[in-house]
Design a protein with these regions (language model features):
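S-adenosyl-L-methionine
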Residues: 1-43, 51-58, 79-106
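Conserved beta-strand/loop positions that form the S-adenosyl-L-methionine
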Residues: 45, 68
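Conserved glycine-rich SAM-binding loop
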Residues: 48
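Conserved SAM/SAH-binding beta-strand->alpha-helix loop
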Residues: 71
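A short glycine-rich, Lys/Arg-flanked "PGG" loop and its adjoining helix->strand segment in the class I
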Residues: 131-145
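Conserved beta-strand signature within the Rossmann-like core of class I S-adenosyl-L-methionine
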Residues: 146-153
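Class I S-adenosyl-L-methionine
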Residues: 164, 169-224
């Protein structure tokens, strides 16, 4: 995501510091301390401007949401939305998703959302796709058996490629569709999703569940 740099970014970020976690690695194994009564802990990777994040958090106040975004110009908009809505169940991480496994204990997250990530269409950039096996292994590390990923995109080639990666890495695929909103809008839409849907672009979605056969990241991979 490319956004225009804003001169007032730092003071705006500072005003949102109560819902931003500055040292997420220190929270591994302790995320529920932010909301002990939480029914679930969910993570959104690449939350962008936060429409999906805040609307889902508002709809499910008994769930703790952790939103990750490395583009600060986008994340500040998401945080400001959360504060304006008075949400107490969503926190933000200013970081790259590639560091996810270092920030969560094994099995600490119940569900991970991947919404409209960059498709990186060129083959030489495949490793940057958020459904590349090295990312899937980290998600599996943070999820318990039966935990899952909800993946949405408007990019059919990326979706089909991702289905192959999920299957090859031992994930169980469920509720796979190449036209999610064919019979009417389902669930909370992202900002991008609303635009694509209005243009008649089919939205692809699937759920991938962690099984005993799912490949899982190990800390030794960092040392290799």
């Amino acid at each position: 995501m490319r956004m225009r740099r804003r001169n007032n970014l730092e003071p705006r970020m500072a005003r949102c510091q109560q819902i931003m976690i500055p040292a997420p690695q220190e929270m591994a194994g302790r995320w529920r301390s932010l909301m002990p009564e939480a029914r679930q802990v969910r993570v959104e990777v690449g939350c962008g401007k936060g429409k999906f994040t805040v609307e889902t958090a508002q709809a499910e106040p008994d769930v703790l949401f952790i939103a990750i975004e490395k583009v600060r110009e986008a994340m500040v908009l998401a945080m400001e939305r959360a504060q304006e809505m008075g949400l107490k169940n969503v926190f933000f991480l200013d970081m790259d998703v590639a560091k996810l496994a270092a920030c969560f204990a094994p099995g600490e997250v119940d569900l991970i959302y991947i919404n409209f990530c960059d498709p990186w269409p060129r083959s030489k950039h495949a490793k940057r796709r958020l459904t590349f096996p090295s990312f899937l292994d980290q998600y599996a590390y943070a999820l318990p058996l039966g935990g899952g990923i909800a993946f949405k995109t408007d990019n059919a080639p990326l979706f089909d490629w991702s289905l192959e990666q999920f299957a090859a890495c031992g994930w169980q695929l469920k509720n796979v569709t190449h036209d999610l909103h064919k019979d009417g809008v389902i669930g909370v839409m992202t900002g991008y999703e609303e635009k694509f849907h209005a243009l008649g672009t089919p939205i692809c979605r699937c759920e991938a569940c962690k099984t005993a056969e799912t490949k899982v990241y190990t800390p030794q991979q960092e040392e290799a």
